[in-house]
């Protein structure tokens, strides 16, 4: 099995951004500071959409490699168990939502896509366009109703549709330009620049955040170089481990976060944690194929103990399709 390294790097970028935003959400927000405004305007609600998009993409990859929807059901049910366990110490976890929406939305959508492909072999109908259109419609509906977790199923479907369509790389630059401009204009409108009617409007903010997520996604793919990929890939390959341990760090640091009026503790906790995770993930993956929680998840998915240790830094294990969290 060959991993798509760009997706690992993009996943790692999202993990780092989520750590920053989650840390900030557990800080006191009065009095407001420049750090609060910067995070809210540039980062808040921009990274979970990337995570959700990647989840839909990885769903297609896993299904194509296994040809087994039962394996996907097991994968999602075990993810639900991880989420319920995490919920005992971190109520804002997203794993339960991902598992439930995956079961309710992605599995039926995969049947729809396969059915259309069987009816019209070689047609665009079987290439993901109906799923993509359905995802866009669901995202528009969710945005009009307050966004939040309601965005997840639509973004899942968009990721699934894009993976089936495989749009050409030459579209990255124009997509980045359009989404970055849209995000900047909408964020300025939401912030009240120029005194427009959209100041403080949550729908305007939600659309700005989605455009920002698209800009970050396409921007990272455009600027990705070997040195940057080497930093982000390990973080992304161990996304489940890093996400869960990151939330544990936030819980442990709740008191200093809530008592710091300057908000510098937010940056200190988030940056220190992400740097530590980058270093640990890189070290771990020179010795093992999968991160600690990724390995447990894999063993549970396949009902067997999967070999994990590398020999002399090389992988001699027989690979199984990767149920890794995007």
What are the residue ranges of the model-derived segments?
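Alpha-helical transmembrane segments and their immediate juxtamembrane cytosolic regions
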Residues: 1-326
């Amino acid at each position: 099995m060959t991993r798509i390294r760009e997706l690992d790097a993009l996943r790692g970028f999202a993990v780092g951004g989520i750590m920053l935003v989650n840390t900030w959400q557990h800080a006191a927000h009065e009095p407001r500071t420049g750090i609060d405004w910067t995070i809210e305007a540039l980062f808040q609600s921009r990274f979970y959409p990337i995570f959700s998009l990647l989840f839909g993409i990885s769903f297609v990859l896993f299904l194509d490699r296994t040809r087994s929807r039962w394996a996907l059901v097991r994968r999602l049910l075990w993810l639900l168990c991880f989420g319920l366990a995490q919920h005992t110490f971190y109520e804002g976890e997203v794993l339960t939502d991902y598992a439930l929406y995956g079961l309710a939305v992605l599995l039926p959508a995969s049947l729809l896509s396969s059915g259309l492909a069987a009816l019209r072999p070689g047609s665009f109908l079987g290439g993901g366009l109906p799923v993509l259109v359905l995802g866009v419609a669901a995202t528009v509906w969710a945005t009009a109703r307050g966004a939040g977790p309601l965005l997840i199923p639509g973004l899942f479907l968009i990721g699934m549709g894009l993976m089936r369509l495989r749009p050409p790389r030459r579209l990255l630059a124009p997509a980045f330009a359009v989404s970055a401009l849209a995000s900047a204009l909408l964020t300025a409108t939401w912030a009240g620049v120029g005194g427009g009617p959209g100041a403080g409007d949550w729908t305007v903010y939600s659309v700005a955040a989605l455009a920002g997520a698209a800009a970050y996604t396409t921007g990272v793919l455009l600027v990705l170089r070997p040195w940057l990929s080497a930093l982000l890939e390990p973080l992304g390959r161990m996304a489940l481990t890093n996400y869960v341990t990151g939330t544990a760090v936030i819980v442990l640091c709740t008191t200093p976060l809530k008592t710091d009026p300057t908000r510098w503790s937010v940056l200190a906790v988030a940056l220190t944690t992400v740097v530590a995770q980058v270093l640990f993930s890189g070290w771990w993956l020179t010795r093992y194929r999968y991160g600690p929680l990724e390995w447990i998840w894999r063993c549970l998915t396949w009902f067997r103990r999967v070999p994990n240790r590398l020999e002399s830094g090389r992988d001699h294990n027989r690979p199984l399709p990767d149920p890794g969290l995007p």
